[in-house]
Design a protein with these regions (language model features):
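Alpha-helix C-terminal capping/termination sites
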Residues: 102, 125, 192-193
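Hydrophobic recognition helices of helix-based DNA-binding modules
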Residues: 20, 96, 100, 143-147, ...
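Short linear motifs at protein or domain termini
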Residues: 1-102, 211-229
């Protein structure tokens, strides 16, 4: 079971949901993983009740599948499902990037994004990729938050939750290739220049390129599988 932080304060179900959400976004659970309420409750240091509430919410969102009694399953993702998610993600995240470019932003916000981007590039160069996906997610959502549309950001997060378990499949082969052309750098430059078309184009290209790589990992049944090392 992936290590999860113990929960010390109320409301327990909300914190359990946040922890599970963050773990899924970070790709810490492989597709097919069975999450039992008891093991999750033990990790959190809570009773089963708040964990059940959190898992029920994620099942209702389509992020997890209902498993055998008192459990849930991290779903596999098919090439077709990935294609559908990519269409939606490109539309939503492209729009968020466009809106971010059309707004004025303070120096502190832009500086944080530049620092995050620099960290991502350093991790790639050093091939220290254990924390790359976390920085990658925070970079993307840093841009989307700049759109000033919280509902849009929330909807984007729901899409990421659905594809989170396979995002780690891009480590290490695909991520290392990002040294060739960096859509992240180009997107940030476009936002800083107020180039809405450029920002949207680069974010959409980033999503599409990664999806193309992930689609190539599908097995004969169309299910995405982690590449063999």
């Amino acid at each position: 079971m992936t290590a999860l932080k113990r929960i010390e304060r109320e409301p327990l179900w909300d914190l359990a949901h946040a922890q599970l959400r963050d773990a899924l976004l970070a790709g810490r659970f492989e597709p097919g993983t069975v999450l039992t309420l008891r093991s999750l409750a033990d990790s959190f240091g809570t009773s089963i009740t708040p964990v059940r509430d959190a898992v029920t919410r994620l099942v209702a969102q389509g992020v997890l599948q209902q498993g055998p009694r008192n459990s849930a399953i991290v779903p596999h993702l098919s090439r077709r499902e990935l294609s559908d998610l990519t269409v939606v993600r490109c539309a939503l995240e492209g729009r968020a990037s466009r809106e971010a470019a059309l707004r004025r932003h303070d120096d502190a916000t832009l500086r944080k994004l530049k620092e995050r981007l620099s960290t991502m590039q350093s991790l790639i160069s050093a091939r220290k990729l254990e924390s790359y996906l976390e920085h990658h997610r925070k970079f993307h959502f840093g841009i989307y938050a700049m759109s000033g549309i919280p509902l849009l950001v929330e909807t984007i997060e729901n899409m990421w939750l659905r594809c989170g378990p396979v995002l780690s499949f891009v480590i290490p082969e695909y991520v290392v290739l990002l040294k060739g052309w960096d859509h992240h750098t180009a997107a940030l430059k476009a936002i800083m220049a107020g180039d809405a078309d450029g920002a949207e184009r680069e974010i959409v290209a980033d999503i599409s390129d990664a999806a193309h790589y992930l689609a190539s990992l599908a097995d004969s049944t169309g299910q995405l599988r982690r590449p063999s090392s």
